């Protein structure tokens, strides 16, 4: 199971792991962590902001919804192409679903371009991301060709069904989303732990100072014979 799950990684995981591991090392030697900006946008660069956006939990949810929507569009296209619904719908309906599907694929193409710009070579370290990108590009090319040649789907219909395999992206998106949320919670807990450790250290220091003050006052009272020494 662990051998399979290691392929369900998303771009940005490596960077976050390195930064959080470095923070763990620094906590042992420096003051506890304060509330700091997200690691990806700490540099205030466009690439950093884009990394944060593409790795965020909300963006993963949007991708999951679009994948489900795209799968539904493809399913309707297949049913229409097989003429299972031909008598029940107008002839323009297939074109509408086809262009809707292309619109969703265009968003996925932009997502891939954004990831390539933001993460560069790190993108190719994640096999599932590369496989997903290949399916998107192939599907987009087929859809563009299909606009001008309606008969091409009869010859390569099985290729467009590859897009239904993108449902696996839902599984990947859920795993990445849950993992990201868990890592963010763990990161916040580490920050809270650091803050609490700092407060404990301050309280211990105050207690030590109070004990010293009590000892000094006790000694002063003894010197003035307020009460005998024990």
UniProtKB/Swiss-Prot annotation:
MF term (GO), any: voltage-gated proton channel activity
Residue spans, topological domain Extracellular: 80-96, 149-155
Signal peptide location: none
SUPFAM superfamilies: Voltage-gated potassium channels
Membrane topology classification: Multi-pass membrane protein
GO biological process: cellular response to pH; cellular response to zinc ion; proton transmembrane transport
Keyword line: Cell membrane, Coiled coil, Ion channel, Ion transport, Membrane, Transmembrane, Transmembrane helix, Transport, Voltage-gated channel
Subunit structure: Homodimer.
The protein's name: Voltage-gated hydrogen channel 1
Organism name: Xenopus laevis (African clawed frog)
